[in-house]
């Protein structure tokens, strides 16, 4: 049952299949087919008055619908106001407002609907877009793709809205047998019955006046028996149908509807009152085409179901099934879709919930994928690559891990290093101290994690003000460095598989000197080098030195103590082989000194390097000697001690278990006696050093 109110949103001056109330003001009327639920108000007195007062209002329909409509005397007043439009023929219609003279042009195309004889769909094209009104229709899957007038340029036209027949838009009617399947079932049953004897008769219990002509014509053609109907007036202009119908009651197939007298039911069940000439009872079966009855079944059934002793149900539908509606709507894909019928037991909202996902308006409303964009940036704090320490609000429990490039080339010649002049502030400002080059930009190299961390800006270290001031007279004398000297980069020591020359081996600290372990240790971040004031002295704790090879600061808490480190620069070779240490300074003569940045980063030696130098015979190089500065707040006693050239032998003794320094002379007995005396009394051995910082190694 149609619930369409007659007007479309895009073209409100047109009324379709509804001719009462507000539709009386329409400029044009359209009728899709001749079923009563689509003809409300068509013969009402108000419509007659409307036609009498207007000369430019017409009813548009198909030629068959016009013939069927005018066969009834009740619609004779429409005879001069009906305009038949041929199927699949685009026709321009003028919509004129007689009061104002306003005129609107639309192009109307009639498409076959497959519902009943003369039923059509209306395709409107005008200034407000393309709109399709289906009326009642039954189209099999894929049939819409063969409608050429729904296509333009090889694809479906851009349809704004579809007003759709949703009679069976219910999952209960997901699949309805096609008309061909129903015809085969009915044909088999009828043939098996009427061939028994002339007294065996079939009655087709059809409730509608139109729509079953498909069954009538096909049964008559297959069995050679005409179908009896009440009247033929409506089909007089349709010879294809008229040929298979008759008003003669003496036939075995009947589709008559209304009895003329009660007596006709005494000897038979036929409405027309047909009886046997011998007054014997006829053997009659009834077949009722229906769809709703099958939709209510909970189990799958056959196309023909026996419901009584002589009654049957045939699944025959004038309307598209649930799956056929979905196929139709998915193919044309309109912007909007509106239901013309509300199925029994459903609501408008439920029907719309089914239609919306098949429309473009719903597809456009769905959230589309797009990158987080500003949303992501709003929730993320972008930090500079050198501001890793600011990632967390709380202090780090462990030292941050620096990233250093590992794909570097090892150049052995960089181990031979000269002292830096004072006129190069970007490389070094403190005498006896050498700084490495700035790290390459992190974005230009691959990285590995380094356990050591220096300052937040490793590539832009500045000399502390305490070192830029006047240097005391006790500082180490500087060499006259070559201005073109190449300063080594500390990252070259991370290359493991390159060849290392003997000259490189001479400049590497031994594993015993570094605490007997080759694994790097964590150190506290030291943002400044040489921050201790002039006059500070270094000392060796006698308590620790008597039990281990560790060099510690008084007041420190192990290896996590914050101590500044520097590397002592070497004297010129021309200065002689002096190995004595005066009151103020200690001047060893190594071949070359190692870069301070190497010590700061506690870099691992290459794999080919002989790090465990346990005797002076294996390696003859003399590495730099490094000592820690005092970290405690108080200054050490001004006691000064000098080491003789026999220090290497004393370190290799059983008391210390430290191998002798390569190329170092043995300390003199008087120096050893002085040291042993200090150790025996538990006093601290203090070496006066100013503006010098040492790196602590295990």
UniProtKB/Swiss-Prot annotation:
GO molecular function per UniProt = 5'-3' DNA exonuclease activity; 5'-3' exonuclease activity; damaged DNA binding; single-stranded DNA endodeoxyribonuclease activity
Q: What class of enzyme is it?
A: hydrolase
Q: Which InterPro entries match?
A: DRMBL, RibonucZ/Hydroxyglut_hydro
Superkingdom of the organism of origin: Eukaryota
Where composition is biased (Polar residues), the residues are 508-521, 552-583
GO CC annotation:
nonhomologous end joining complex; nucleus
Q: How is it modified after translation?
A: Phosphorylation on undefined residues by PRKDC may stimulate endonucleolytic activity on 5' and 3' hairpins and overhangs. PRKDC must remain present, even after phosphorylation, for efficient hairpin opening. Also phosphorylated by ATM in response to ionizing radiation (IR) and by ATR in response to ultraviolet (UV) radiation.
- Organism the protein comes from: Rattus norvegicus
State where composition is biased (Acidic residues): 449-461
Tell me which Gene3D superfamilies the record gives.
3.40.50.12650, Ribonuclease Z/Hydroxyacylglutathione hydrolase-like
GO BP, one annotated term = adaptive immune response
Which intervals carry biased composition (Low complexity)? 538-551, 641-655
**Protein function:** Required for V(D)J recombination, the process by which exons encoding the antigen-binding domains of immunoglobulins and T-cell receptor proteins are assembled from individual V, (D), and J gene segments. V(D)J recombination is initiated by the lymphoid specific RAG endonuclease complex, which generates site specific DNA double strand breaks (DSBs). These DSBs present two types of DNA end structures: hairpin sealed coding ends and phosphorylated blunt signal ends.
What family is it from?
Answer: Belongs to the DNA repair metallo-beta-lactamase (DRMBL) family.
Task: List the PANTHER family.
Answer: DNA CROSS-LINK REPAIR PROTEIN PSO2/SNM1-RELATED, PROTEIN ARTEMIS
Q: Where is this region: Disordered?
A: 445-485, 505-595, 620-669
Record's Pfam families? DRMBL
Modified positions (Phosphothreonine) in chain numbering: 380
Sorted keywords for this record are:
Adaptive immunity, DNA damage, DNA recombination, DNA repair, Endonuclease, Exonuclease, Hydrolase, Immunity, Magnesium, Nuclease, Nucleus, Phosphoprotein
Subcellular location as annotated:
Nucleus
State whether it acts alone or in a complex, and with which partners, per the record: Interacts with LIG4; the interaction is direct. Interacts with ATM. Interacts with BRCA1. Interacts with PRKDC. Interacts with TP53BP1. Also exhibits ATM- and phosphorylation-dependent interaction with the MRN complex, composed of MRE11, RAD50, and NBN.
Which positions are tagged coiled coil?
none
What this protein is called in its record is Protein artemis
